[in-house]
Protein backbone atom coordinates (compact mmCIF):
# COMPACT_ATOMS: atom_id res chain seq x y z
CA UNK A 1 0.00 0.00 0.00
CA UNK A 2 1.03 3.60 -0.43
CA UNK A 3 3.10 3.00 -3.56
CA UNK A 4 4.41 6.18 -5.11
CA UNK A 5 5.85 6.23 -8.58
CA UNK A 6 7.86 8.85 -10.40
CA UNK A 7 7.50 10.17 -13.92
CA UNK A 8 9.60 13.04 -15.22
CA UNK A 9 10.94 13.68 -11.73
CA UNK A 10 7.45 14.17 -10.27
CA UNK A 11 6.11 11.95 -7.51
CA UNK A 12 2.71 10.59 -8.46
CA UNK A 13 0.24 9.17 -6.04
CA UNK A 14 -1.22 5.89 -7.23
CA UNK A 15 -3.80 5.46 -4.45
CA UNK A 16 -4.94 9.08 -4.65
CA UNK A 17 -5.40 8.62 -8.40
CA UNK A 18 -7.46 5.46 -7.82
CA UNK A 19 -9.62 7.28 -5.26
CA UNK A 20 -10.17 10.14 -7.73
CA UNK A 21 -11.47 7.92 -10.54
CA UNK A 22 -15.12 8.37 -11.44
CA UNK A 23 -17.55 5.65 -10.45
CA UNK A 24 -19.17 3.79 -13.36
CA UNK A 25 -22.52 5.29 -14.32
CA UNK A 26 -24.40 2.09 -13.42
CA UNK A 27 -23.17 2.40 -9.80
CA UNK A 28 -24.54 5.93 -9.46
CA UNK A 29 -28.07 6.24 -8.12
CA UNK A 30 -30.40 9.04 -9.19
CA UNK A 31 -31.35 11.57 -6.57
CA UNK A 32 -34.88 11.05 -5.23
CA UNK A 33 -37.51 13.32 -6.75
CA UNK A 34 -37.23 16.82 -5.31
CA UNK A 35 -33.67 16.21 -4.05
CA UNK A 36 -30.39 17.51 -5.44
CA UNK A 37 -27.46 15.36 -6.46
CA UNK A 38 -26.98 11.81 -7.64
CA UNK A 39 -25.08 9.56 -5.24
CA UNK A 40 -23.13 6.35 -4.76
CA UNK A 41 -24.46 4.14 -1.92
CA UNK A 42 -22.50 3.89 1.33
CA UNK A 43 -21.54 0.19 0.85
CA UNK A 44 -20.00 0.95 -2.55
CA UNK A 45 -17.97 3.84 -1.12
CA UNK A 46 -16.79 1.57 1.72
CA UNK A 47 -15.80 -1.24 -0.65
CA UNK A 48 -13.84 1.11 -2.90
CA UNK A 49 -12.02 2.66 0.05
CA UNK A 50 -11.07 -0.82 1.33
CA UNK A 51 -10.05 -1.94 -2.16
CA UNK A 52 -7.72 1.01 -2.72
CA UNK A 53 -6.38 1.74 0.78
CA UNK A 54 -7.09 -1.30 2.92
CA UNK A 55 -8.29 -0.97 6.52
CA UNK A 56 -9.14 2.50 7.81
CA UNK A 57 -10.26 4.12 11.05
CA UNK A 58 -13.75 5.60 11.24
CA UNK A 59 -15.25 7.34 14.24
CA UNK A 60 -18.48 9.16 14.97
CA UNK A 61 -17.00 11.87 17.15
CA UNK A 62 -20.24 13.48 18.25
CA UNK A 63 -23.97 13.21 17.69
CA UNK A 64 -25.64 16.53 16.94
CA UNK A 65 -29.00 17.00 18.65
CA UNK A 66 -31.85 19.40 18.06
CA UNK A 67 -31.81 21.95 20.88
CA UNK A 68 -35.44 21.78 22.00
CA UNK A 69 -36.28 18.09 21.56
CA UNK A 70 -32.85 16.49 21.90
CA UNK A 71 -33.48 14.39 18.79
CA UNK A 72 -30.45 13.34 16.72
CA UNK A 73 -30.24 15.56 13.63
CA UNK A 74 -26.66 14.90 12.56
CA UNK A 75 -23.20 13.75 13.51
CA UNK A 76 -19.58 14.78 13.27
CA UNK A 77 -17.39 12.00 11.83
CA UNK A 78 -13.65 11.44 11.45
CA UNK A 79 -12.00 9.19 8.86
CA UNK A 80 -8.31 8.28 8.99
CA UNK A 81 -6.73 6.49 6.02
CA UNK A 82 -3.21 5.82 4.82
CA UNK A 83 -2.92 7.11 1.26
CA UNK A 84 0.32 6.73 -0.64
CA UNK A 85 2.29 6.32 2.57
CA UNK A 86 0.76 9.34 4.31
CA UNK A 87 -1.73 9.07 7.16
CA UNK A 88 -4.61 11.42 6.34
CA UNK A 89 -7.48 12.40 8.64
CA UNK A 90 -10.57 14.18 7.35
CA UNK A 91 -13.71 15.27 9.18
CA UNK A 92 -17.20 16.11 8.08
CA UNK A 93 -20.72 16.57 9.35
CA UNK A 94 -23.59 14.38 8.23
CA UNK A 95 -27.20 15.40 8.60
CA UNK A 96 -30.53 13.60 8.83
CA UNK A 97 -32.43 14.43 5.67
CA UNK A 98 -35.68 12.76 6.76
CA UNK A 99 -36.40 12.41 10.46
CA UNK A 100 -36.99 8.73 11.19
CA UNK A 101 -38.57 9.54 14.59
CA UNK A 102 -35.92 7.27 16.14
CA UNK A 103 -32.50 8.37 17.39
CA UNK A 104 -30.85 5.11 16.33
CA UNK A 105 -32.09 5.35 12.75
CA UNK A 106 -31.32 9.07 12.60
CA UNK A 107 -27.77 8.43 13.87
CA UNK A 108 -27.30 5.70 11.25
CA UNK A 109 -28.41 8.02 8.43
CA UNK A 110 -26.26 10.90 9.70
CA UNK A 111 -23.25 8.58 10.02
CA UNK A 112 -23.67 7.38 6.43
CA UNK A 113 -23.77 10.96 5.13
CA UNK A 114 -20.79 11.98 7.26
CA UNK A 115 -18.77 8.98 6.08
CA UNK A 116 -19.52 9.68 2.40
CA UNK A 117 -18.59 13.34 2.84
CA UNK A 118 -15.30 12.35 4.49
CA UNK A 119 -14.60 9.91 1.64
CA UNK A 120 -15.38 12.67 -0.86
CA UNK A 121 -12.62 14.78 0.71
CA UNK A 122 -10.25 11.93 -0.21
CA UNK A 123 -11.48 11.94 -3.81
CA UNK A 124 -14.08 9.15 -3.64
CA UNK A 125 -17.21 10.28 -5.47
CA UNK A 126 -15.88 13.84 -5.65
CA UNK A 127 -16.97 14.01 -9.29
CA UNK A 128 -20.60 13.86 -8.16
CA UNK A 129 -20.18 17.01 -6.05
CA UNK A 130 -17.99 18.86 -8.57
CA UNK A 131 -20.10 18.10 -11.64
CA UNK A 132 -18.76 19.58 -14.87
CA UNK A 133 -15.95 21.29 -12.96
CA UNK A 134 -14.35 17.97 -12.00
CA UNK A 135 -10.77 17.56 -13.19
CA UNK A 136 -8.82 15.78 -10.42
CA UNK A 137 -8.77 12.35 -12.08
CA UNK A 138 -7.31 13.76 -15.29
CA UNK A 139 -4.77 15.83 -13.38
CA UNK A 140 -3.54 12.75 -11.49
CA UNK A 141 -3.71 10.37 -14.46
CA UNK A 142 -0.19 9.36 -15.44
CA UNK A 143 -1.26 9.42 -19.11
CA UNK A 144 -2.18 13.08 -18.76
CA UNK A 145 1.24 14.22 -17.52
CA UNK A 146 2.43 17.12 -19.56
CA UNK A 147 -1.11 18.26 -20.30
CA UNK A 148 -2.26 21.16 -18.19
CA UNK A 149 -5.85 21.39 -17.08
CA UNK A 150 -7.16 24.87 -17.68
CA UNK A 151 -8.79 26.04 -14.48
CA UNK A 152 -11.85 28.25 -14.67
CA UNK A 153 -12.54 31.06 -12.28
CA UNK A 154 -15.60 30.73 -10.10
Language-model-derived ranges and their functions:
Residues 40-144:
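Positively charged, aromatic-enriched nucleic acid-contacting surfaces
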Residues 1-17, 24, 136-154:
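Interfaces that engage single-stranded nucleic acids at replication/repair/recombination sites
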Residues 9-42:
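Contiguous, often N-terminal, cationic amphipathic patches that form binding interfaces
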Amino acid sequence: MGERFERNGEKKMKQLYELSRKFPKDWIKKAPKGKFGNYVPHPVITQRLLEVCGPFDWEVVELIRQETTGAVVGCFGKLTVEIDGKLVTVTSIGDVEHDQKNDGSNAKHAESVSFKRCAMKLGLGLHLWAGEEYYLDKQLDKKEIGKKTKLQSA
